[in-house]
UniProtKB/Swiss-Prot annotation:
Species: Pyrococcus horikoshii (strain ATCC 700860 / DSM 12428 / JCM 9974 / NBRC 100139 / OT-3)
Known role: Involved in the biosynthesis of the thiazole moiety of thiamine. Catalyzes the conversion of NAD and glycine to adenosine diphosphate 5-(2-hydroxyethyl)-4-methylthiazole-2-carboxylate (ADT), an adenylated thiazole intermediate, using free sulfide as a source of sulfur.
Cofactor list: Fe(2+)
Binding site for Fe cation: D154, H169
Name of protein: Thiamine thiazole synthase
Length: 252
C-alpha cells in the first residue's frame, strides 16, 4: 500500500541529507548554465566538493533555445574536445563549425554533472555573499519564490572556499561586491561580435575578487566585452579554465 506520508518523508529526509552534506564546500557555483555546469564537472572530476545553486526551476541557462528558438547550437574547433568528453553528438556544418542539438547538449551535460557527484539545488537564489577578512567565503541563499513574493524571510548560508559567478549577462553575484564598493562598476556586455566574444570569454574568466571567480557571460559583462550569440564553445572553455585554476589553488 502506498502512503502519502511515506512519499513525503522520503523526499524531505533525502533532500535534508543532501543539503546538510553541502553546507561546507570547496566551490559553490551560482548558476547552472553552460559555463557553470562544465566548471562543476571538471571540479568534481578533480576531486573538489562542489554544488550548483540555480534560481530557476530548470537548469541549462540559454542552451535550450539555441538561436531564436531554433534548438541547435554551434561549437568551434577549440571546444570540440569538450563535446567529445561529454559524449555529445554533433555534425560538421563547415570547416571549424560544429552543430549540436541544444536539448542533447543541455541534458547530457546536466546528467554528466550529477553523475560526477555534483548536487544541483534548483529554485534556490543567492541573495548575498559571505565576506570575511576581505575574501568571499560563501553564499547567502533563500528560496526563489520567497524572494519573488517579497516576503521578509531570513536566509541561510553555505560556506565555500571559492564561489563562481556563472549567472550570465547580469553578473548577479559580482554585483553584490559592486554594491558594497568592493568591485568597480560593471559595464555590462558589448554588442555582438562572435569571434571576439568567444575569445574574450575565456580570457576574462578569472578571480575578480579574493574567493570569487567569474565565468561565461558574467566574465564578459564585467569586462565590457562583446556578446557572441548561440555559439557555446567559449562557455565550455571558460568553465573548464575556472575549474582548472581553482583546482590548482585548492591543492597548493
Amino acid at each position: 500500500m502506498l502512503r502519502e506520508v511515506t512519499i513525503t518523508r522520503a523526499i524531505v529526509e533525502s533532500y535534508y541529507r543532501d543539503l546538510l552534506n553541502n553546507l561546507e564546500l570547496d566551490v559553490a557555483i551560482v548558476g547552472a548554465g553552460p559555463s557553470g555546469m562544465v566548471a562543476a564537472y571538471y571540479l568534481a572530476k578533480g576531486g573538489a566538493k562542489v554544488a550548483i545553486f540555480e534560481k530557476k526551476l530548470s537548469i541549462g541557462g540559454g542552451i535550450w533555445g539555441g538561436g531564436m528558438g531554433f534548438n541547435k547550437v554551434v561549437v568551434q574547433d577549440e571546444a570540440r574536445e569538450i563535446l567529445d568528453e561529454f559524449g555529445i553528438r554533433y555534425e560538421e556544418f563547415e570547416k571549424g563549425y560544429y552543430v549540436a542539438d541544444a536539448i542533447e547538449v543541455a541534458t547530457t551535460i546536466a546528467s554528466k554533472v550529477v553523475k560526477s557527484g555534483v548536487k544541483i539545488f534548483n529554485m534556490i537564489e543567492v541573495e548575498d555573499l559571505v565576506i570575511k577578512d576581505n575574501r568571499v567565503s560563501g553564499i547567502v541563499i533563500n528560496w526563489t519564490p520567497v524572494l519573488m513574493a517579497g516576503l521578509h524571510v531570513d536566509p541561510l548560508t553555505i560556506e565555500a572556499k571559492y564561489v563562481i559567478d556563472s549567472t550570465g549577462h547580469g553578473a548577479q553575484v559580482a554585483q553584490f561586491l559592486v554594491k558594497r564598493g568592493l568591485l568597480k562598476e560593471i559595464p555590462g556586455e558589448g554588442a555582438m561580435w562572435a569571434e571576439q566574444g568567444e575569445k574574450l570569454t575565456v580570457k576574462n574568466t578569472r578571480e575578480v575578487f579574493p574567493g570569487l571567480y567569474v565565468t561565461g557571460m558574467a566574465a564578459n559583462a564585467i569586462a565590457g566585452a562583446p556578446r557572441m550569440g548561440p555559439i557555446f564553445g567559449g562557455m565550455f572553455l571558460s568553465g573548464r579554465k575556472a575549474a582548472q585554476e581553482i583546482l590548482k589553488k585548492l591543492k597548493s
